[in-house]
Amino acid sequence: MTQNHYTTSIFANCSKHYEFEILLETCTNSTNPCHAVSQIQSAITIAYVDYYTSVALFSIAALLDIYCLIITIPLYRRMKDDSKKKYVFLITRCISGLLLVVAWLLIQCIYLRFIAPSQDNLPYYVLALALNIGSTYVLLGSYVGMAGILYLGVLNPIAFNQHLTLRIVYIAVCIIFVISIFISIPLAIFQALMTVPTSSMSCTDTACAPLITLINFVLVFGSLITTTLTLTFVLISLCRHRKEFKKLDTTSNTSLNSAVRLLKFTLFAVLLLVAAEVIPFVISETKKKHSVVTGCYYFYHSGKVIQYAVFALTESSIWSIALIIDPLINIIFDRTVSKKATDQVKWMRKSCVGLVRKVTKRSNPENFTETSEI
């Protein structure tokens, strides 16, 4: 900007200036434009922090899910059918978590950062949304399935061994995937149309948007509440069983303690997802209160811009933490997977120590000469 522009600008008396000020010159009704533009800049900074932390944390979550699959799948192939029943859902958790991370990276770091959703890329945007929604329901379904397997395996071993076959578990996983796809595709289409209306279809605030929001709310929180109640019920049942038989069988207590710890941290991850899902609905309900939003509205209410940016940062942070915790739960608290991971860590440590010793010896050839002379 030139000096002449600053003298005629509503930001002329501001101590700091920003390149985007020219876009707000027509917003002359602000009582404190300097404070407002500063808050807009703060919101932009928060958005940058959101972007970079999302890339870092979701990438860590993806690597952990991949590592969990690398450990679990070879173990799964060598297991007997009774053991495979539990690990089907563990593998499903890792796969759905990985797909969910990919969806978050697509939406958070590509469409919301580099490529604005438009009619040209609408099918790809719908695909990313469907992947996000569907993976969430598959993840929650795998939580419920895993809890059911643990409940039957500990409290009703006869039903677990005689009536629950591996084929039934596979069918249950397929049903979870089919239901998730059936739910995610239409929801993704209508959510995309809220952002990018087309000439043939649209989803406005006066037409379908309230209904889609309500349906999404019922489905999301219904599934989250169902998952939370199921995990809580199974956890309480296992804790009571552990208390009753604590002094009878040390071996079963070891397995039972592992199952209880697994359920506790899984329940914690689900509660994080509940908190993360509350935020979008809070934002949407807040925005609904403003029926008419002009181009200068958010400049006049710059505090709300920071509020929305903080909400977005909090939501993505909670999601990323939950998706990092989930594979860690499988790796740390499942006895078989944990033992395999521990063996790999020991092997890597031993290999690194051996490599360092070789490099050290090669870098000090005098030591070899002295040793041979002696």
Curated annotation (Swiss-Prot):
Q: Which InterPro entries match?
A: Put_GPCR_Chromadorea
Question: Which compartments is it annotated to reside in?
Answer: Cell membrane
Q: Which domain of life is it from?
A: Eukaryota
Gene3D superfamilies associated with the record = Rhodopsin 7-helix transmembrane proteins
GO CC annotations, alphabetized: plasma membrane
Report the membrane topology from the UniProt record: Multi-pass membrane protein
| Membrane-spanning intervals of the chain | 55-75, 87-107, 138-158, 170-190, 217-237, 263-283, 305-325
Question: Which interval of the chain is the signal sequence?
Answer: none
Stretches of the chain found on the membrane's Cytoplasmic side: 76-86, 159-169, 238-262, 326-374
User: Member of which family?
Assistant: Belongs to the G-protein coupled receptor 1 family. B0244 subfamily.
PANTHER family on file: G-PROTEIN COUPLED RECEPTOR-LIKE PROTEIN B0244.6-RELATED (PTHR37441:SF1), PROTEIN CBG16518 (PTHR37441)
This protein is called Putative G-protein coupled receptor-like protein B0244.6
Q: Look up and give the organism this protein is from.
A: Caenorhabditis elegans
